[in-house]
Amino acid sequence: MLCVVLALSSGSLLAQTTFPLQGTLKKTADRTPVDFANVLLRKPADSTLVVGTTSDEHGGFRLEAPQGTFLLEIHALGYKPFHKTLTLTGALDLGELLLTEEAKELSAVQVTGRRPIMLRKADRMVFDATQIAPAASSILDVLRQTPGVNVSDDGISLIGKGGVIVLINDKRIRLSGAALISLLRSYPQSDLQEIQILTTPPAKYEAEGNAGVLNLILKKAKNDFFGGSISPRFGFRRERAIYSLNTNLNYKKDKVTASLQLGGGWASYDNSLGTYRTYPKQGTFHSSETAFSGKGPHFNVRAGLDYAFTPELSMGVNVSYSPEKDDTRRENDSRDYRILPSGERELLRLLPGVADETDKSQYTTANVHLEKTFKSAPQRRLSWDADYVGYRSQEGRNFTSRGLMPNGTPIPGSDFHFDALTDQHTDSYITSLDYTEPLGKGTLGFGAKGTWTRTTNRSDYDAKSSMGERHDRITFDEHVYALYADLNQPLSDKWSLRTGLRMEYTHTAGENNGRRLEHLKSYINVFPTLFLGFNPNDRHAFSLNGTVRLNRPHFGQLSPFANYENQYSILHGKEDLRAAKRAQLALGYTFLGALNFQLDGGYLWDGITQVIRLDPKTNVGSYTHDNAEKTWTFGLENSFFFNRVSFFQTYISQRLWYSDMKIGPESTSLYGGAGLSYHVSLNNTFFFNRSKTFQGTCYLYYRTPSYDGGFHMGHMITGGAGLSYTLLQGKLRLALDAYNLLRNNLRLDVTTPDYQMNVENGSNPFNCSLGVTYSFGAPIQGKSERKSSQELRSRM
């Protein structure tokens, strides 16, 4: 860590009567909190250190000192030093102390004091978003270039660690998949201040997210200001066009803060998937190659309104709506072969097929929140949230295939057809109450939360389908009640402790086609978190952290009804899926805030994965979601940040790990594997002029073969580059991005005594885009003055 907790100098101080001294540090420009600043109290005569601490994430600090006159000294990276002489005769609250950014003017672009691109804090890794991907157009593009973060059409995850909970300004975004991707694409890169990856999140956060929490901190709106940005974007994915238009509006005047994000666009894509199955005992081989092509619009709107009744009491509302439509055509070529003694294959049958799919989905979310702070104790905080999340999905699918002899002659009775409609309705109601109380030099937080969710899944096949007419319906209720407590306490001038405990009670019930689900169970889980930090000086920092997390099943995975891809591949959910759980312990070391090492170990049990069962006689494959994964993982991570020259900076992250994975229900093991794996990512930024208005980036990610979800995955490489140019005093920004300049198709393998299955996924096509962001706005008071001047001139 760049900064360390500075504490009481000796035992002689402890023998005296002390009084509390507290305050809150904020940025002069926009009154946003300044965290992790060094707050020092010195003797005026010889500048001897009396006591010291650091500000928390809200900018608050608290010291204990004896009676007397002292020099208060505050240092924060990127800010001018703050000095103030004060006399302490009793408890003293300094209120808000404003820090001014240390900046100099370079060619009309303001460059503030250099922040490290990465900073390790007590329970999180913090990346400076302005440096990690300066050529990116949107927040989504920044995340694509953030080390360790994986962005796909299905959502966001941490590489090698699974899914995460996504927050914006500490508020959970209750979207997933394409809806989440669309929302993050609507925010311009310039709105993002930092990216926080909480690998050991406090107990106040849900126990979900087996990799932790991803918190996106946006820049605060200026006071007495109305403005925003508009961002058109156009590009190609392979040879197919993609385009979008996103607009952000922000308003802040006195007690009112409002925001509006509008985004929409059109995307078209193509993809390929090949599945190859070999049955050695039967001497047969089956191939299935599918080409996808799709297109569709997406749209999102998100609005927020906050009102500050007093400086210590505020209330707000956020709503969002994200509809999307996707039309996909699949052309499938399936073939059956006999394996000859020579090893060659003899074609037995062809099964060409065509499928058309239309998927419509929409998310609706609403949040009401109330927050109370206390001037007498800046770290004391009370907050209440109430949320609604609604999800609707409807998918219409049809598939038709014909069986043909190698010479093209139709095979009687081999035709396969279905026409299906599936839909999912999910409604969740959530409320939580959180309270934080100063406790000596630390804080104690506790709270409660309740979640009530109902999901209905329906599956209908018409009478002309080869499997006959079917109509199925399942309703699933889940209630989760949680209590938690968090303690953040410095133990001495070198040791700090953060620990928490979260208890969750989960009640489940449901009906399958009118039949009550008797085997669903209610259960209690306890989730501890621990962080222990040791900072011997300002050059070295050590940490020990441990946590237990869980990953609840997606509600679509609870539907047990057959979902046909074709006659050879059938997908099932499971109505009594349990949450997957992961325990992890990590030991970390940081040198000068730039060189980091972490040694960790973890165990995953009840992991949710698709269990594959193939019938060698019929080649029918069943893919069923089940609590079937058990994995031990041990790893060593390293990262390094270099910015010693003015024209170049780089961030290197790498990980070496060993995993032992078994896939199978209960105590059985159907397949899996064990072995060493390695990945490395490099993120480079080049500055082509002194004012840093013309920048370039290039990034590279490589992973050796590894195991995931029971599959043996082949090596993977991706790389891209970007250019950005800023002009008009930072108001206009042009960005050109190219993704997957280096890429390879992903290969997955499963081997059992009865079969071998290989999958080749061509889901990483080259794509490039040109984005333009124009930012506008002005002080509200200034606008009024200009209007008054115009009226005066008209009278003259």
Enumerate the predicted regions with their spans:
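Short, acidic, small-residue-rich periplasmic hinge/interaction motif at the N-terminus
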Residues: 26, 38-42, 75-79, 93-133, ...
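Short, acidic Ser/Thr/Gly-rich low-complexity loop/linker segments typical of extracellular
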Residues: 44-60
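A short, solvent-exposed loop/turn motif at the edges and junctions
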Residues: 44-48, 71-85
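N-terminal periplasmic accessory domains that precede
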Residues: 95-98, 139-142, 180-183, 197, ...
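Short acidic/polar hinge/loop motifs at secondary-structure boundaries
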Residues: 172-199
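Face-selective signature of the C-terminal outer-membrane beta-barrel domain
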Residues: 302-324, 355-512, 535-539, 593-599, ...
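Outer-membrane beta-barrel signature, preferentially recognizing the C-terminal barrel domain
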Residues: 424, 476, 550-598, 603, ...
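Gram-negative outer-membrane beta-barrel transporters
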Residues: 627-703
